[in-house]
Design a protein with these regions (language model features):
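A short, N-terminal "cap"/entry segment at the start of jelly-roll beta-barrel domains
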Residues: 1-56, 128-191
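Short histidine-centered beta-strand/loop micro-motifs
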Residues: 26, 60-68, 85, 110-111, ...
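Short, conserved beta-strand element in jelly-roll/cupin
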Residues: 51-55, 66-83, 121-124, 184-188
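Short acidic-glycine-tyrosine-enriched beta hairpin
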Residues: 87-104
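Short, structured interface segments
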Residues: 117-129
């Protein structure tokens, strides 16, 4: 790996404990509260990771919008969300389900369970939200929408010293032309 490839990377370590969580109201969506997971600072603004909780699910919708970004990933931790996405129609994500929403894809979250929680990761950290699709989108890596529903059969057992782990690949490598690779990792037994 070249020196330039390593020197322009952020190298800070970040962690955030739920017990010590600081939640914020961003004002844009009063029915959500947000917890910064420290990735923005650690990555020098290249990425953002947030834990988002629904605090009021009464007839709340986000309205049609899209985002000017390079990557958006949502992983449902608890509850469910219903949304409509351009080119996909109606989608419901439940605990363990996830989606990659490409840049400038119009979508509207239309319903949330009262206990809805999601982890959202974006690249870059600063994202512009638009209520209309722009006529000129600039250059973006080829990207397609992926919706991945939790299926225990989709996990693959690790090999060698990691044989106590199982991996579930989301298919984002192909969907983002190699920009992002993402997996869920879980134990399949004792870790000794």
């Amino acid at each position: 790996m070249s020196d330039s490839a390593t020197t322009d990377r952020a190298t800070d370590f970040a962690f955030d404990c739920l017990a010590d969580a600081v939640w914020h109201d961003k004002g844009q969506r009063s029915f959500f509260r947000y917890r910064d997971l420290g990735v923005t600072k650690a990555s020098g603004g290249r990425m953002r990771a947030e834990h988002i909780q629904c605090v009021n699910s009464d007839n709340s919708t986000t309205g049609w919008h899209c985002h000017d970004l390079d990557f958006q990933f949502v992983y449902v931790v608890k509850g469910h969300v219903a949304f409509t996405a351009e080119g996909w129609g109606d989608v419901v994500l439940k605990k363990g389900d996830c989606a990659h929403i490409p840049p400038f894809t119009m979508h509207d979250e239309t319903a949330f369970s009262p206990d809805f929680e999601v982890i959202e990761i974006t690249m870059p950290a600063e994202v512009t939200t638009l209520t209309e699709k722009p006529t000129s989108r600039g250059t973006r890596p080829d990207s397609k929408m992926i919706v991945d529903y939790l299926d225990d059969d989709s996990f693959v057992r690790g090999e060698g010293p990691r044989s106590f782990l199982e991996y579930r690949d989301f298919g984002f490598g192909d969907a983002t032309s190699g920009l992002v690779q993402a997996q869920v990792v879980r134990t399949n037994g004792p870790c000794d």
